[in-house]
């Protein structure tokens, strides 16, 4: 009797590795592979500072991210090899208060 080997079909899961900036608060860099910054422009890396590992995250099956649009992250990773998440703009509490007072 002859054995038949059936190859396993492996889907390529999309992961990202997220690094925190050592120079800029609330700034994060998403890359495809751990410690691989080869596709990130040198000028960006210089301004970003020493990357500090924040987390590794699977993107497949995920519906959303906390502070970034999932589809934009996936597209940026596949097209340019990185995604830069900048901090949200600061709230102008005085302006909000003055507009609510009228």
Swiss-Prot record:
PROSITE patterns referenced in this protein's UniProt entry, alphabetically: YCGL
Pfam family, one: YcgL
Domain YcgL as annotated: residue spans: 14-98
Residue ranges the record marks as coiled coil: none
Family matches, as InterPro entries: YcgL-like_sf, YcgL_dom
PANTHER family reported in the protein's UniProt record: PROTEIN YCGL (PTHR38109:SF1)
This protein's name: Protein YcgL
Species name: Salmonella agona (strain SL483)
Gene that specifies this protein: ycgL
């Amino acid at each position: 009797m002859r054995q038949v080997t059936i190859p396993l079909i492996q889907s390529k899961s999309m992961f990202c590795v997220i690094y925190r900036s050592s120079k800029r608060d609330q700034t994060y860099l998403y890359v495809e592979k751990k410690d691989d910054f080869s596709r990130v422009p040198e000028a960006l890396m210089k301004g970003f500072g020493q990357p500090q590992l924040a987390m590794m995250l699977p993107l497949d099956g995920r519906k959303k991210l906390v502070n970034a649009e999932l589809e934009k992250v996936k597209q940026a990773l596949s097209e340019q090899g990185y995604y830069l998440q900048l901090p949200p703009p600061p709230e102008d509490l005085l302006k909000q208060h003055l507009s609510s007072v009228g």
